[in-house]
């Protein structure tokens, strides 16, 4: 039986990969929602604003036949409290639309992350487990999770949430993307004739880190949404093993034909404005895709990730126990995604 997926946020790193993966299987009809005019190939894309409840309820036919809904989008706001309120409203709007038009709804899935455990606020217990205490509030994960559980009570459909960490993948026009940032950063330093210094702090260079590829996350989202054992469950999902940037960085440098170096002396937001004028020249020199640098990278986002001084780690035991055994080798995955960026003329 063909399932029908609704992917809200099909233009983002996670949503784009999930929608593409589902469409490629041939077993799913995929409807994508986002603000961009187009979605991934094979996806019926709708340019809708998920915060406009009246407009959504005016189009119940848009989600007719949807059996599985995946919320991969996030609405940004000025502060954490406002962001929590906004994203809870986004979830309620999605469920209202589904209840109006998707009579056969079976499952609603959310993508959250290890901020659930407070990884952004300071040292936390590692490896983190799904039943560990919540980190500091406000955080929109908590508001969405509580709202989802409340909306599901007494309904035939179930839910799941996945908690990845630092998703590796890419989507055009998304600045909050670590692998694209690394690629652009390396291209700029190479054009300047410099070594590839690590773009973070000495502590971040040495600490235990983890990541989740968008490919792996897409597979896990589809699995959790269709496995009876995952009904109403929260699941950590990372590549598997942890890593240290000091061990991966030489491979990144080799990919770009550069000599690796240790941590840079300045944070990205101070360092990179001096190099940004080189980007148009790099685009012309290597025939890269057109577009402004700010559409590819957000130095503040990268600086935040590369400044964390404490260990990160999540236990994937629950997902494995319930049946998801796939994992990724961190070095192989990072180089594969950089290769895809090069293939698509995003970085040289």
Q: At which residue positions do the language-model features occur?
A:
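Conserved beta-loop-beta element that borders a ligand/cofactor-binding pocket
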Residues: 147-176
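Substrate-positioning beta->alpha
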Residues: 177-181, 200-225, 232-233
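NAD(P)H-binding glycine-rich loop region in Rossmannoid oxidoreductase-like domains
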Residues: 38-39, 47-93
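Conserved Rossmann-fold NAD(P)-dependent oxidoreductase catalytic core, especially the SDR/UDP-sugar
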Residues: 67-71, 82, 89-140
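Mid/C-terminal beta-alpha module of Rossmann-like enzyme folds, strongest
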Residues: 217-302, 315-317, 321, 338-345
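Conserved glycine-rich Rossmann-like NAD(P)H-binding loop of the short-chain dehydrogenase/reductase
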Residues: 27-37
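SDR active-site strand-loop-helix element
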Residues: 8, 33, 72, 108-114, ...
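N-terminal Rossmann NAD(P)H-binding glycine-rich loop of SDR-like oxidoreductase domains
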Residues: 3-25
């Amino acid at each position: 039986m063909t399932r029908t997926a609704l992917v809200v946020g099909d233009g983002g790193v996670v949503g784009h990969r999930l929608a593409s993966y589902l469409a490629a299987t041939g077993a799913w009809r995929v409807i994508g929602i986002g603000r961009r005019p187009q979605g991934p190939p094979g996806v019926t894309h709708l340019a809708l604003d998920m915060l406009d409840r009246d407009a959504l309820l005016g189009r119940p036919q848009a989600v007719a036949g949807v059996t599985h809904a995946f919320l991969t989008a996030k609405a940004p706001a000025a502060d954490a409290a406002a962001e929590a309120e906004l994203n809870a409203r986004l979830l309620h709007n999605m469920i209202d639309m589904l209840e109006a038009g998707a009579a056969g709804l079976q499952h609603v899935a959310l993508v959250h992350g290890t901020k659930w455990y407070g990884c952004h606020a300071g040292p936390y217990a590692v490896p983190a487990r799904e039943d560990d205490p919540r980190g500091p509030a406000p955080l929109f994960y908590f508001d969405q999770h509580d709202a989802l559980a409340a909306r599901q009570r007494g309904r035939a459909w179930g839910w799941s949430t996945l908690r990845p960490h630092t998703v590796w993948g890419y989507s055009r026009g998304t600045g909050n993307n670590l692998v694209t940032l690394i690629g652009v950063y390396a291209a700029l330093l190479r054009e300047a004739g410099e070594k590839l210094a690590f773009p973070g702090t000495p502590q971040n260079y040495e600490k235990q880190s983890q990541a989740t590829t968008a490919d792996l996350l897409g597979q896990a989202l589809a699995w959790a949404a269709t496995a009876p054992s995952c009904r109403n469950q929260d699941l950590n999902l990372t590549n598997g093993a942890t890593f240290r940037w000091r061990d991966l960085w030489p491979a990144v440098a080799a990919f770009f034909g550069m000599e690796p170096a240790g941590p840079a002396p300045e944070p990205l937001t101070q360092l990179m404005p001096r190099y940004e004028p080189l980007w148009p020249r790099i685009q012309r020199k290597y025939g890269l895709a057109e577009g402004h640098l700010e559409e590819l990278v957000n130095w503040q986002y990268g600086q935040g990730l590369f400044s964390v001084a404490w260990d990160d780690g999540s236990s994937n035991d629950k997902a494995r126990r319930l049946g998801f055994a796939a994992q990724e080798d961190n070095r192989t995955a990072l180089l594969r995604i950089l290769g895809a960026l090069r293939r698509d003329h995003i970085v040289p």
